[in-house]
Structure formats: C-alpha cells, structure tokens
C-alpha cells in the first residue's frame, strides 16, 4: 500500500547510497527521480522473498511529467499597465505584492499570470516541492512535477490549514507554496491571527511547528500575492462609494501594520475607462516576452549577491542598495510623509534595486526610487482616510 512522502524517502535513501523498497502504488511518484537504488514491490511477501535472495525486485519505470501549456498569458489582460509592470517587478525580485481595487478590475486575473513570468523550477526546487506535496496529496505529485506551486486558499481557511499542524504536524498552505506563490484573495476576510502567523515565515522562509508528539520545521519560502477591495463595499470614492471614512478605516484595520509591512509593493488596480473593453485593442506583451526581462534581472541579482533582492538582509541592503546623498535625503523626506517604518523603507530600497536590475543599471537612480515609491497604494489610501477624519 502506498504511503505519503515516498519521493522524499527515496531521494534521501539514494543520497546516502542506500537502497529503498517502495510500494507499487508509489511507482509513478518515485519514477520521477529515476533513482538506481529504488525498488518496487507489490506485496510484503515479495519483499521477504527479495531479502532471502529468492526473488528479484524491479526498479520503477521512469515517469514523465505531465506537460501543461501556459493557461494564463499576460497579453490577455486589457489595460492595467501599472499592474502589469508591478507584476514584472514582483517576479523579477521575488517580492510580495498587494493588489487593491474595486471588484471586477482584474486583480485575480493579474495574480494568476505571475507564474508565467517566473523561471522553471530547478532540480533541487522540484524535489523540495514534490516532497512536501507528497505528504498531503501523493496523487498530484506527477501532475505538479516541475510546476511552480500556486496556492490560493479560501479566506475561511483555518490557522492550521494555513501554517500546518495536527497531532503529527503536517505541512500547511504556506509550505505547499514553497518555491512558488501563495495567493490570498479577499485579504481582509482572513482571520487576523491567521495572517499575523504568516509574518515570521515570510521573513525566515520556514515554519516551526511544535506539538506534543513531534516538533518539525517545514520550508515555506514563497512569494505572497494578495488582493483586496479598498472598502467593505468595494469602493472608497466616486458615485459607487457607500462607506464613511470611519467604516473604510475600520475595514482596513483588520490588517495589522506589521503584516502590511511585509508587502514590498501595493498597487491600485482601478476600474477600466468606459468603452475600453468594446474597442479593438492591440494585444500587450506576452508572458514569454516579459519573462525574458525577468530572467535577465534575476541573473544580475544572483551574479551580484547570489540571491534575489527580496531576500537581502540589512547589511546586504547597505552594500547593494547604495544611494547618492541627495537621493537618500529625498527618500527620507518621502518616508516621513508616508509614515513608513524602517522595515517598509528597506523593502522600498529592495524594490528600487529590482527596478534598476530590470533596466540593467548598476546604480539606483532617483527615477528608480520614484517608481518604487509609486507602488505604495495602501499607504496613500490610509493617509487619505486619516485626512478626511481630521
């Protein structure tokens, strides 16, 4: 009978130079790694006979990954140029992205296209992601092999479902999104304690689970992409707005400041101009075209610092995100105006560094800083509401 985690067990056995016998039900799963030390048995009697030298066991047949064409292309998105640009920067630097806008503006449509901009999984990443998925859904390992994870849990998901748990702690959504994207739609509808539990994994790339029977650490290095309405009714200005500033601010306060600080970019996704959807529109850039720029920017980052900009720590930010003195003074004044924290300042610098890398620039210019500051929609919204209340 098949067991969860077979591909992980087989990989570790092969690494250590040992042989492993796996159930026939797990053959398709372990066949993906094509390991010489892996053998298949369909019954315990066959295992006993093999150990007694009376029966030979076969190696698993090599399994081909299920090929899937790109389903969501960036060229399908009409308008929303700033949203597309923000998605490119997010993919290039490994950043976290928050999309804010009324219902029907294309927030989910944009988010679903980020995987088409990301590089293919390396062998190591593919094994890591498959090992985690095998623990909860072994049947999907072959289908998802070498596919970058894109997890989109419902806002009713419990804390345990999100971060993992159980008597013997199993992986949650954040670990299933390892090496991929965790998409949270209707962000303020999630429980606040569930969202705040994501803060540490976002910083460290792992989650520590401690229960009576076991303590375990799962990898959880994912990109967080989230979408939300700007108010309870979906609008905060114009004829569609039916909320007072107090109601809107109370709605936004469901999200803690420290949690919002984890987003490197927050973009406003507005309603499209009247008539644009009925016009003949020239298709925009394809995902493949944008992906080329993303790959070039990532190559610069790994050549310079051996990691993506999103994962730079404080000393590395000082080393790789240097500014001219005049630009540093300008940025300081901007941060004071927006009321940003030190963490938000560091994330803004990392976004500017990514924009410079997309431009193939060795230095961060004022133009790069200004563009990075323009992706702080949540801060501008909060300032706008606070002014209305004073």
What is the meaning of each model-derived region?
Residues 98-139, 204:
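Walker A/P-loop
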Residues 179, 185-187, 197:
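Walker B catalytic acidic pair
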Residues 15-16, 34, 92-94, 156-157, ...:
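Short loop/turn elements that form and flank the Walker-type P-loop nucleotide-binding site
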Residues 55-89, 93, 123-174:
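P-loop NTPase nucleotide-binding/switch module
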Residues 1-98, 102-108, 210, 344-345, ...:
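Peripheral, non-AAA+ core regions of ATP-driven protein-machinery
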Residues 168-169, 191-385, 389-390:
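Basic, amphipathic alpha-helical bundle interface domains used for macromolecular binding and assembly
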């Amino acid at each position: 009978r098949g067991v969860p985690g077979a591909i992980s067990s087989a990989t570790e056995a092969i690494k250590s130079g040992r042989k492993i016998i796996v159930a026939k039900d797990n053959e398709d799963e372990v066949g993906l790694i094509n390991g010489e030390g892996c053998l298949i048995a369909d019954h315990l009697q066959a295992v006993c006979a093999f150990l007694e030298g009376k029966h030979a066991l076969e190696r698993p047949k090599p399994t081909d990954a299920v090929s899937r064409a790109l389903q969501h292309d960036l060229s399908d998105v009409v308008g929303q140029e700033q949203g597309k640009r923000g998605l490119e920067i997010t993919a290039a630097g490994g950043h976290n992205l928050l999309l804010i806008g009324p219902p029907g503006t294309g927030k989910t449509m944009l988010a679903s296209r980020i995987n088409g901009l990301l590089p293919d999984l390396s062998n190591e990443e593919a094994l890591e992601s498959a090992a985690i998925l095998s623990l909860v859904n072994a049947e999907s390992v072959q289908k998802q092999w070498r596919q970058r994870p894109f997890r989109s849990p419902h806002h009713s998901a419990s804390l345990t479902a999100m971060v993992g748990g159980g008597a013997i702690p199993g992986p949650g959504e954040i670990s299933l999104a390892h090496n991929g994207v965790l998409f949270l739609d209707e962000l303020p509808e999630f429980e606040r304690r569930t969202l705040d539990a994501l803060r540490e994994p976002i910083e460290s790339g792992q989650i520590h689970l401690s229960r009576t029977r076991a303590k375990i650490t799962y990898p959880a290095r994912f990109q967080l992409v989230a979408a939300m309405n700007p108010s309870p009714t979906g609008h905060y200005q114009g004829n569609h707005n039916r909320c007072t500033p107090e109601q809107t601010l109370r709605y936004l306060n469901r999200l803690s400041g420290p949690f919002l600080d984890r987003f490197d970019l927050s973009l406003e996704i507005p309603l499209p101009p009247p008539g644009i959807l009925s016009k003949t529109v020239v298709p925009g850039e394809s995902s493949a075209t944008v992906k080329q720029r993303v790959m070039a920017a990532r190559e610069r980052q790994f050549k310079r610092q051996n990691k993506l900009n999103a994962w730079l720590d404080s000393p590395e930010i000082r080393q790789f995100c240097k500014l001219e003195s005049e630009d540093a003074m300008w940025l300081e004044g901007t941060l004071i105006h927006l009321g940003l924290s030190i963490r938000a300042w560091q994330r803004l610098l990392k976004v500017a560094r990514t924009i410079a890398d997309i431009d193939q620039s060795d230095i961060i210019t004022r133009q790069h800083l200004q563009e990075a500051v323009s992706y702080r929609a949540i801060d501008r919204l909060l300032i706008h509401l606070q002014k209305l209340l004073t």
